[in-house]
Amino acid sequence: NISDEQIFSQIERMNEDFRNTNADALDATHPYFPIQADVEIEFCLSPVDENGVSMAEPGIDRVDGNRVDWSRDQIENQLKPTTIWNPNLFYNIWTVKFAASDANLLGYAQFPDQTGLQGIPANSPATTDGVVVRYQSFGSADKGNFPVMEAPFNKGRTLSHETGHWFGLRHIWGDGVCAEDFVNDTPPHR
C-alpha cells in the first residue's frame, strides 16, 4: 500500500497541473506557454464513500485483491467492476502493481462514454470508468520522500496525463505521425 502522503502529493500535483500553477506555468520557453490556461478544475478526496458513510481515510478505499500484481485483463474484468464507485458522482482512480505482461505501462484511462466527441470511441462500460496508474508513478517525489516511486516518472504527471484522456483528450499527435487529435486549436505537432 502506498502512503496517504503519497496520495495527497498526487492530488496536489493534479490541482497544480489543472489550475496552471505548476512550475512549468512560469517557463516562457515552453512552446505552449502562450496558450496555456487554468481550466478551473480542482480535485479533492471525498470525505464519504458512495453510500454517504464517513471514511477513515477520506477518498481512499484500500482493496485487498489477493494478488501480488494485476494484468490489464484482470483489472478490467475483476478489479474495476467489483470496486468502482458511481462514475456519475466520483472520479475513480486505481493504483496497482502491473503484472509482468504490462510492466512497461505507466497507466491508462478509459475515454468518456457517449460524449459525441469526434475521435472518441463510444460504448465504454460504466463498470470500468476511470484511470489506472502503476503505484510507482502515483504521487510526486517533489512533495515528499516516497521510496516506492521510480524516476523519471515520479513527478505526478502520469495521472495528469491520463486524466486528460479520461476527459476526452487524445494525444496532440493523434497517436500517429502528425495525425488528428480532433481539437481545432491544437498547434500542429512535428
Cite the ranges covered by each PLM segment.
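…and closely analogous acidic/polar surface helices at protein-protein or active-site interfaces
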Residues: 4-8
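Acidic/histidine-rich, surface-exposed loop or edge segments in extracytoplasmic proteins
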Residues: 1
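Metzincin-family zinc-dependent endopeptidase catalytic domain
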Residues: 12-190
